[in-house]
């Protein structure tokens, strides 16, 4: 599945030995129940593969590298492996990867230096509108650029260990810092562009991880990004992760939703 290949194959420059194994490489914690009502769990053939963000009753935003041939989603979940009466299951009627995302990169066994993963966004149209409740709510797109130094919250059910790919039952939250893009450009061999955000902790240990892709990055209370890619192992010191800079895509998101309502 291509979303796994992307995460595992990205190469880094100027990076020394990996940090020792940590029980929670993302350095996160159990999110307060129902505190992230826009969080979406994206599935392929009954397997959780990515995160997502509910934008309105009919649309979910996720990462383009999560592309597969069919999807289903769960809304309003807190426990990944348990049934919850308040959660809502929806099929996806159609997916809309950003036309500027280079899908051919997902076919490669290894990712070459200089590869450009810009435009890592995809919209999913739900087959049936979500019911808006206390635990299922959309979140608005940003209206202004985020500032480096902002405190951000990322969330998801991705791996909580760096190499053994251990998923949690509880939705995980982690606080990280928005950094200048130069911090990422120095350590990745792939391109870091202005449609990306760089976020993490330079000391390591706090990070998103495999299968968090497409989930929300909320900075100073505003949705500013979605998880794109990061180092292997996750939480590597000196290596922040890459997120898609959503304000650069407001027009595409709104136009796509309107034309395909």
UniProtKB/Swiss-Prot annotation:
Glycosylation sites: 102
Propeptide feature: residues: 17-24
Record domain Peptidase S1: where: 25-258
Disulfide bonds: 31-173, 50-66, 152-219, 184-198, 209-234
GO biological process assignments: zymogen activation
Alphabetic keyword roster: Disulfide bond, Glycoprotein, Hydrolase, Protease, Serine protease, Signal, Zymogen
Reaction(s) catalysed by this chain's protein: Hydrolyzes mouse Ren2 protein (a species of prorenin present in the submandibular gland) on the carboxy side of the arginine residue at the Lys-Arg-|- pair in the N-terminus, to yield mature renin
Record's GO cellular component terms: extracellular space
Record-linked Gene3D superfamilies: Trypsin-like serine proteases
Name of protein: Epidermal growth factor-binding protein type B
EC number: 3.4.21.119
Similarity comment: family membership: Belongs to the peptidase S1 family. Kallikrein subfamily.
UniProt GO molecular function: peptidase activity; serine-type endopeptidase activity
Signal peptide as annotated in the record: 1-16
Top EC class, one word: hydrolase
Its biological purpose: Cleaves REN2 at a dibasic site to yield mature renin.
High-level lineage: Eukaryota, Metazoa, Chordata, Craniata, Vertebrata
Active site per UniProt: 65 (charge relay system), 120 (charge relay system), 213 (charge relay system)
